[in-house]
Curated annotation (Swiss-Prot):
It is a multi-pass membrane protein. InterPro entries: DiS_bond_form_DsbB/BdbC, Disulphide_bond_form_DsbB, DsbB, DsbB-like_sf. It holds the Pfam family DsbB. Residues 1-11, 64-70, 165-176 are cytoplasmic. This is Disulfide bond formation protein B. Gene3D superfamilies: DsbB-like. It is found in: Cell inner membrane. The chain crosses the membrane at residues 12-28, 47-63, 71-88, 146-164. Keywords: Cell inner membrane, Cell membrane, Chaperone, Disulfide bond, Electron transport, Membrane, Oxidoreductase, Redox-active center, Transmembrane, Transmembrane helix, Transport. GO terms for cellular component: plasma membrane. Residues 29-46, 89-145 are periplasmic. The gene is dsbB.
Length: 176
């Protein structure tokens, strides 16, 4: 019988979710709807791509070593954990009272060209007016709220993968 929760199948699931998430963001939200991603959205995409990259390596090479599997899992978890933290911050900014929303800044490109990386991170997480605006909702949820739900599901998937790494399925002996 086919097991859906094998190590390799779970890694392929993560790769597929990355492809769907990135395609939705690029083709639907950016190209079709015409939304430009704010700095926090870009950072969420980077985290999703990091997770997808590690999951792709794990799915393609299917390492047998528990150490290699754990390292790939840790890299993948770091990527999606980063994305979830950024999405959480984004949701928080969207729920601030209007008088507490930070003003719009010059933009991520300008910051990357003129500021050291530590200052860029500080500016991005401080947020800006564009990060606090809600451009589109689906089922009453903003894009960052939907992203946070997706990232939470992917973190739960990582816990299932960890379970598969530390306790791999062993074939049951045939009954006599």
């Amino acid at each position: 019988m086919l097991q859906l929760t094998t190590y390799r199948n779970l890694q392929v699931f993560l790769v597929i979710m990355t492809a769907i998430g990135m395609s939705f963001a690029l083709f639907f939200l950016q190209r079709y709807m015409g939304f430009s991603p704010c700095p926090l959205c870009i950072f969420q995409r980077i985290g999703l791509m990091i997770m997808g990259g590690f999951a792709l390596i794990a799915a393609l090479f299917h390492p047998k070593s528990m150490v290699i599997r754990l390292l790939l899992w840790l890299g993948s978890l770091a990527g999606i954990g980063w994305a979830a933290i950024v999405a959480g911050r984004h949701v928080w900014l969207q729920h601030l009272p209007a008088d507490q929303v930070p003003s719009c800044g010059p933009g991520l490109d300008y910051w990357l060209d003129t500021l050291p990386m530590q200052q860029v991170l500080k500016e991005v997480f401080a947020g800006s007016g564009e990060c606090a605006s809600i451009e589109w909702t689906f089922l009453g949820l903003s894009i960052p709220e939907q992203s946070l739900i997706l990232f939470s599901i992917l973190i739960l998937t990582h816990l299932l993968i960890l379970w598969r790494i530390v306790r791999p399925s062993t074939p049951k002996p045939l009954a006599r």
